[in-house]
């Protein structure tokens, strides 16, 4: 990390599956883990941004909101609630003839997820995102209701099953100009 900062002028790092860096046992995460503290307390790294993807694949790996002050975290609760508000609520309302969940859950996320991040850390600890390198792309979110991970050898076991997506009437690729237009509009929204 020091080499990247001092020699390459890197100003920040995103740590993939970052909760593994704070593991003290197979199922326990410690936000004060010596490795995390060493990164935080290194004077040559003091001015860098530290962004954690606050989960890993192990038991007890989901740690959104639990990193120490000085870390920012990807906020998957924001991602999921925005996707619900943007796409899933519409889909649910159409299919179930019921009112969508509404704006309440969306508002708490948009306002900084105070129920996830402590007051000491505040809303700037949250890195809000809708799509990333894992899971559905934005195009997938408006084109598929379910994942189709068959061709990669995992028989569909990989990836999340709850993508909170809405295909706008046709699953996957289509040449229907009406479906394509509404998908493009949804992406712009």
Residue ranges and their predicted role:
Residues 1-24:
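Active-site groove signature of glycoside hydrolases
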Residues 25, 30-189:
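Conserved alpha/beta catalytic core and glycan-binding cleft of carbohydrate-active enzymes
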């Amino acid at each position: 990390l020091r080499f990247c900062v001092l020699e390459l002028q890197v100003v920040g790092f995103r740590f993939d599956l970052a909760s593994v860096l704070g593991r003290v046992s197979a199922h326990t995460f410690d936000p004060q883990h010596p490795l995390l503290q060493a990164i935080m307390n290194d004077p040559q790294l003091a001015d860098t941004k530290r962004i954690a993807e606050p989960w890993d694949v192990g038991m007890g790996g989901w740690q959104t909101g639990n990193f120490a002050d000085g870390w920012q975290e990807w906020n998957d609760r924001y991602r999921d609630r925005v996707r619900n508000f943007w796409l899933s609520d519409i889909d649910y309302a159409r299919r179930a003839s019921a009112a969508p969940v509404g704006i309440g859950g969306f508002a708490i996320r948009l306002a900084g997820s105070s129920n996830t991040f402590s007051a000491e850390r505040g809303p700037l600890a949250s890195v809000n995102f809708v799509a990333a390198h894992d899971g559905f792309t934005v195009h997938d979110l408006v084109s598929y209701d379910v994942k189709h991970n068959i061709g990669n050898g995992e028989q569909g076991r990989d990836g999340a099953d709850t993508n909170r997506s809405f295909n706008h009437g046709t699953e996957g690729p289509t040449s229907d100009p009406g479906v394509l237009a509404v998908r493009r509009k949804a992406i712009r929204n």
